[in-house]
Amino acid sequence: MTRILLLLLRFYQYFISPLLGNNCRFHPTCSEYAKEAISMHGSIKGLWFTFKRIIKCQPFCDGGYDTVPISIKNSKPLNKKI
């Protein structure tokens, strides 16, 4: 499922997005955010993060820099005991 979603996003980025122009208020763009979210968190949780991001992408939001939340499972401890 994850691989299919990433292929669909790549298709969108190469063939549809150039026709629509640069309209995203955020950095990274919503499609890049979706690719990162799905790659990091899997298809279901990644789609949930993407849905929340697209809902925020509207005229009353200032936009700005918005990154995918880091998974606690994938993060490394900051203070390693030697």
From Swiss-Prot:
Q: Give the membrane topology, semicolon-separated if more than one.
A: Peripheral membrane protein
Q: Where in the cell is it found?
A: Cell inner membrane
| Entry annotated with the keyword Membrane | yes
InterPro entries assigned: Membr_insert_effic_factor_YidD
Q: Name one GO cellular component term.
A: plasma membrane
Is Membrane found in the keyword set? yes
Q: Which SMART domains match?
A: Haemolytic (SM01234)
Q: Which UniProt keywords apply?
A: Cell inner membrane, Cell membrane, Membrane
Q: What does this protein do?
A: Could be involved in insertion of integral membrane proteins into the membrane.
Q: What's the family?
A: Belongs to the UPF0161 family.
Q: What is this protein called?
A: Putative membrane protein insertion efficiency factor
